[in-house]
Design a protein with these regions (language model features):
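Membrane-interface catalytic loops of GT-C/OST-like multi-pass glycosylation enzymes that act
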Residues: 1-5, 46-64, 108-114
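Membrane-lumen/periplasm interface segments of multi-pass, membrane-embedded glycan/lipid transferases
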Residues: 1-23, 121-142
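Hydrophobic, aromatic-rich transmembrane alpha-helices
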Residues: 6-29, 70-77, 89-96
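Transmembrane helix-loop junctions and nearby membrane-interface residues
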Residues: 19, 23, 47-50, 81, ...
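Signature aromatic-anchored transmembrane alpha helix within multi-pass, membrane-resident enzymes
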Residues: 28-40, 80-107
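Extended hydrophobic/aromatic segments used for targeting, binding, or gating
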Residues: 30-42, 50, 54-60, 64-67, ...
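Membrane-embedded, lumen/periplasm-facing catalytic core of multi-pass transferases
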Residues: 57, 90-142
Length: 142
């Protein structure tokens, strides 16, 4: 949870749905296949990094280059949401959750200090998997 793409940008869950939606036209279908392949290849490549978590950072640092791809795949979802109120509400809730997480990282020092407190992340990378202490909730603790 400490570096997960979908933990830090929950609205990108809908991008996965957008990857499955069939775009109109043969060229768009080919483009979709290429873009999905780029995202998948990127994911596989960074998985082989020794410090796949990106060191002292906030969020999925190595996935930041993929943001335009995930936003592209939100386009058909947003288009479909105009006629499906439940999808529009889900989009709004996931977007709000995404903003909340990034607000914590941008405005709360405790979220960034998570990398070194209580122990340096690079010495104890097992902390990345601790659901009881995600960095974006650190500032909410008493």
């Amino acid at each position: 949870p400490a570096r997960g793409l979908l933990t830090f940008v929950p609205v990108f869950l809908l991008s996965i749905y957008g990857m499955l939606l069939a775009p109109p036209g043969a060229q768009a279908k080919r483009l979709r296949g290429y873009l999905v392949a780029v995202v998948a290849l990127h994911w596989v490549l960074i998985s082989f990094y020794e410090d796949w978590w990106g060191g002292h950072s906030f969020g999925p640092r190595y996935f930041s280059d993929m943001t335009p791809y995930f936003v592209y795949f939100l386009i058909p979802v947003v288009a479909r949401a105009r006629t499906r109120p439940a999808l529009l509400v889900l989009f709004g809730l996931l977007t709000a959750a995404s903003f909340f997480v990034h607000y914590q990282g941008a405005m709360r020092w405790a979220s960034y200090a998570w990398n070194v407190e209580p122990v340096d992340l690079n010495r104890a990378p097992s902390r990345l998997w601790d659901w009881k202490d995600p960095p974006f909730l650190r500032s909410l603790r008493p």
